[in-house]
């Protein structure tokens, strides 16, 4: 009786078979499992542009090239080309800018839910884990194939990136209207707080990328982390917290609560969800 194949081989065989079969079949999450969090300070051999103008976004949003020509509906996964930098013969720019970013997008539940709600807005998921990024890319590719001819899900994309290090390499000043930070790693130990995705330094980068009037959405099931994020955003001169009435009137809040994988897990476990929204205010005159 032969030995059972190791899980890594099963995952590899599954991904190879996906490239040879119907692209409209949704990927199975069990073949893309990875540890819950990654160390943002490690060298992950990431590929990133020197500046936003060098990024070729047409690989991730093929329906929105500058020239008005629809490119083949394809997403380059990490087994092929993690990221393409524009060369002199191809601008790599889009008809419109990315306006919504989900930092640490996980398995892409929020991206997929937002796509039909804001079909004319480009949204991007940033995820540091390789297998999870590949899953989201495959899921987007399958959803586009299932909805061919409708334009659905053409407005979302996902790349592997370390948001704590390279956010300004991808995004221009005042480019974004929304930033989502959903169920981030709480890093409970005090010596690990420097790895939290919300800090005075990182909030300045969010303020750089977010236009005046833009919103940062935060949600967590860890109350001390919720308090930490609120304190750091309120203390930053570029942000003000929205009132509870404003939060309840924002349709994205309910989506954020119910459509992320972590949000569903908290609901199943009957846990609490702590939400806070922060508005980017105008810079003072210099």
UniProtKB/Swiss-Prot annotation:
Pfam families: Methyltransf_4
Source superkingdom: Eukaryota
Compartments it resides in: Nucleus
Phenotype upon gene inactivation: Significant reduction in pathogenicity on the host plants. Mutants develop penetration hyphae into cellophane, suggesting that appressoria of the mutants retain basic function for penetration. However, they fail to develop intracellular penetration hyphae into epidermis of the host plants.
Keyword Methyltransferase: yes
Gene Ontology terms, MF aspect: tRNA (guanine(46)-N7)-methyltransferase activity; tRNA binding
Primary location group: nucleus
Record EC number: 2.1.1.33
Role description: Catalyzes the formation of N(7)-methylguanine at position 46 (m7G46) in tRNA.
The protein's name: tRNA (guanine-N(7)-)-methyltransferase
Source organism (scientific name): Colletotrichum orbiculare (strain 104-T / ATCC 96160 / CBS 514.97 / LARS 414 / MAFF 240422) (Cucumber anthracnose fungus)
Gene responsible for this protein: TRM8
